[in-house]
Amino acid sequence: MIVTTVALASCGSKAADSPPPTISPAQAAVSPAATEAPAGSVRPLAGRGEAVVFDVATSSSVVLNSDAAGGSALVTFPVTGPSRTVALPSPARAIVGDGSGTVYAATKGGYFTVNLGTGDAVARFDVDGENDTDFTAITRRADGKIVLGSASGAVYTLSSATAVGARLQIFARVDALVAEGDTVAVLDRGQTSVTTVDPSGSRQQHALRAGEGATTMAADPEGRILVADTRGQALLVFGTDPLMLRQQYPVPGAPFALAGSSRLAWVSQTATNTVVGYDLATGIPVEKVRYRTVQQPNSMTYDDKTGTLFVVSGSGAGVQVIPGAGS
């Protein structure tokens, strides 16, 4: 097995006049039917899980769920106790939480906020002048500013709940956003690239190629950016100050879902219904544990306090709960 640790220079800090040529975006593998019982327990979820976050204040995982008719809902799964479903007024594409009881969901023209404490307090915020914009990604910076990404390749940094403070249009598409402090990392599947945007929101800091077909991105508590190179069958680990590829490790089985924790980086293998925990502390990822999962493990989150890993099926097979994962 070959392990590669690479440090790359930035592709440049100046914004490009137009996006470079794109490739066909990579996707998760279509998982086979599960042939072994998943680790832990499985809680039912009617529909397809699209994304998941963990909210520390309510000790709950929150799943963005879609139904056959195209509607969206947030389904909250406490570590203990029954789940709760909150229907959203229109389809949502991505979610982020503040860890303090509020979840933000990107939708066409703006975003929703959901108060997890009450469960039914849904508010909509329309971004000024962007009624027809298809927002596909969302994150929240350390200073509380909301940042949205669009299908047309723009990143919007809001200066208030609805006002656009800065707009950066240099991407082919925006598939995921992750905030490290007030710096935002952008994943573009079409360019298979990771780019950091400065705190003003108006300037690209650095941009790097991300493997052969990057699909997902997550942050860990150590300030690292994890990226799944699904087409290239690898886990990529980036530092952010400056943006630099620090680790590249082969992960077979169409790696896709990611979750960072204080001890391990979690990667799902969608071709085999498996999740693997890697220790990144030595500079070379070391496999520490693996679990069988629900079919189509397309999204994950982790509760560091209880050591619980939540694996969400993208095919309707439910939400898998693995207590003490990695211990």
Model feature map: region roles:
Residues M1-V3:
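Sec-dependent N-terminal signal peptides
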Residues V6, C11-S327:
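Predominantly soluble domains enriched in secretory-pathway, periplasmic, or organellar proteins
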